[in-house]
Amino acid sequence: MSRRGTAEEKTAKSDPIYRNRLVNMLVNRILKHGKKSLAYQIIYRALKKIQQKTETNPLSVLRQAICGVTPDIAVKARRVGGSTHQVPIEIGSTQGKALAIRWLLWASRKRPGRNMAFKLSSELVDAAKGSGDAIRKKEETHRMAEANRAFAHFR
């Protein structure tokens, strides 16, 4: 048994312009090689493009996209008796949001296009509408969990 206490859960800080935690989570996830100012630039340009495309609040589009992509359940590999099973597990809200952001960035990097801001804005708008690769990834994860429902007792 560990003598150390449990780690306190850190609350995500909000970004300077929109004062939103989701934007900050997105910035920290898009960050490469410590270039945070470039990450902020990319996110803010993407949000500006969303504003121009949809003529609505870009934060509501971002929130809608993340809620649409957030999975309720995922599969985890668990070794039982010499064979590995994909065991479905429920996901908490924080972990679900983190997965959703990761999938949105993965899908936007895969997209053809001029720059990351353009690709990210397109993916966010598509995800808010209920289409796009990130939504497909969520549905695929849910299908995997449904297919392996028989192994749920291995939790």
Curated annotation (Swiss-Prot):
Keyword terms: Chloroplast, Plastid, Ribonucleoprotein, Ribosomal protein, RNA-binding, rRNA-binding
Alphabetized GO MF terms: rRNA binding; structural constituent of ribosome
Gene Ontology cellular component list: chloroplast; small ribosomal subunit
Subcellular location, principal: plastid
InterPro entries tied to this protein: Ribosomal_uS7, Ribosomal_uS7_bac/org-type, Ribosomal_uS7_CS, Ribosomal_uS7_dom, Ribosomal_uS7_dom_sf
UniProt family annotation: Belongs to the universal ribosomal protein uS7 family.
Biological role stated in the UniProt entry: One of the primary rRNA binding proteins, it binds directly to 16S rRNA where it nucleates assembly of the head domain of the 30S subunit.
UniProt-listed HAMAP family: Ribosomal_uS7_B
Subunit structure comment from the entry: Part of the 30S ribosomal subunit.
The protein, known as: Small ribosomal subunit protein uS7c
Organism encoding this protein: Hydrastis canadensis (Goldenseal)
Source organism phylogeny: Eukaryota, Viridiplantae, Streptophyta, Embryophyta, Tracheophyta
